[in-house]
Amino acid sequence: MIPVTSFRGKKVALFGLGGSGLVTARALVAGGAAVVAFDDNPDSVAKAQAEGIATADLHTIDWSSFSSFVLAPGVPLTHPKPHWSVDLAKAAGVEVIGDIELFIRERRVHAPDCPFIAITGTNGKSTTTALIAHILQSSGRDTQLGGNIGTAVLSLDPPKAQRFYVVECSSYQIDLAPTINPTAGILLNLTPDHLDRHGTMQHYADVKERLVAGSGTAIVGVDDSHSTLIADRIERAGVKVERISKRNVVSEGLYAEGSQILRAHGGTSSLLVDLDGIQTLRGSHNAQNAAAAIAACLAVGVSEEEIRAGLKSFPGLKHRMQPVGRRGNVTFVNDSKATNADAAAPALSSFDRIYWIAGGLPKAGGITSLSPLFPRIAKAYLIGEAAAEFAATLGEAVPYEISGTLDKAVQHAAADAEKDATAGNVVMLSPACASFDQYKNFEIRGDSFVAQVAALEGMTMLVHSGKGG
């Protein structure tokens, strides 16, 4: 745990006592802050009380006596409208921050020069974050991995010199971290997502920009217009920018040509690594993820040789284009993390004949952008609330059925793929949708897919059944 000593003796209000919120409350108490916490869920309040954390309905407190208000990242700060606790804090002139900001302030006090790599973007954050941490760990460096990837940042070990922090940051977390200042900050890409929480694409982009604007080295993917503008703007403001691209040659930075990652500097380009044969980094999207990871590791002093070794031994992540089973000539792939069309595109681009399970809670734009990839789809099996919308988009271009539920989709797709004599058939869950209409999160959806694949007769599993690997 990182005790938040920079708030010792100060009164801090906190809302949100879920996983990271409870960790934050503990860290503030351990650092000597006087914490008053609350949550809309009485069970969460009771759990905090059982640990000796002071709780009170934040409607009733005297806000003028508090120095700061810490908000859990899952609670609306601005859109669709501010949470009532945010309104109360702002009315009293109390700053509203999150756990990433608390980490930043502790680092600033105790180890301001310890390497801190922060990663954001619409797609690819978790893979890039895990890849950077793996390269650092495999090269023998003291590495702490946390943030949006699943481990609360304040549950990590305290900052000290030569301890490396690799932190995945969601837009919600950045919004609550006004002084974020990583050694190396990564913005992978920007496409419409979470607009229910940010209102407009411009506000979403502005929030993401904060992470790289405060970085020692800003690593920015320039394959979309919003990110390109951000790279140009922060460079004019004096930030050192490394551009990365999976589509085009860049004059300064890293870019991909097929499976090769090249570094451009001073008018010349040199080969850094060839990803060919690294199954966990298959596809052009992973070329971008690898380029970003390489740039970040170079920025914090990792050698090219250490980076190459780490790339080759990367085990990959669950729910991300993950082969989970094989039966006959059919491979079953779990890509449950693909919660929008842009995230599904890399997997659809990586295989030639796909029995595609898609659907769930649809995002803005649906799957229209995937139409160039429709020829790769042998048949689609549509589930969840998006089924009718996706069926209308597929029209006569792709055979489809409305399966409704994941279990039916797996059974029907497996049967159809088995009848197809084409080599290299793939049954793939790559939903292009959020999971919340049928599952609590994409992980549970992916684990359900794996369990249902494991239940098919004659299946050779490539991961532990029901656990997604």
Swiss-Prot record:
Pfam families: Mur_ligase_C, Mur_ligase_M
Subcellular location: Cytoplasm
GO terms under cellular component: cytoplasm
Pathways involved: Cell wall biogenesis; peptidoglycan biosynthesis
Reaction catalyzed: UDP-N-acetyl-alpha-D-muramoyl-L-alanine + D-glutamate + ATP = UDP-N-acetyl-alpha-D-muramoyl-L-alanyl-D-glutamate + ADP + phosphate + H(+)
Keywords: ATP-binding, Cell cycle, Cell division, Cell shape, Cell wall biogenesis/degradation, Cytoplasm, Ligase, Nucleotide-binding, Peptidoglycan synthesis
GO biological-process terms attached to the record: cell division; cell wall organization; peptidoglycan biosynthetic process; regulation of cell shape
InterPro entries documented for this protein: Folylpolyglutamate_synth_CS (IPR018109), Mur-like_cat_sf (IPR036565), Mur_ligase_C (IPR004101), Mur_ligase_C_dom_sf (IPR036615), Mur_ligase_cen (IPR013221), MurD (IPR005762)
Binding, ATP: G121, T122, N123, G124, K125, S126, T127
EC number: 6.3.2.9
GO molecular function terms noted in the UniProt entry: ATP binding; tetrahydrofolylpolyglutamate synthase activity; UDP-N-acetylmuramoylalanine-D-glutamate ligase activity
Function: Cell wall formation. Catalyzes the addition of glutamate to the nucleotide precursor UDP-N-acetylmuramoyl-L-alanine (UMA).
Family: Belongs to the MurCDEF family.
Name assigned to this protein: UDP-N-acetylmuramoylalanine--D-glutamate ligase
Organism: Agrobacterium fabrum (strain C58 / ATCC 33970)
Source lineage: Bacteria, Pseudomonadati, Pseudomonadota, Alphaproteobacteria, Hyphomicrobiales
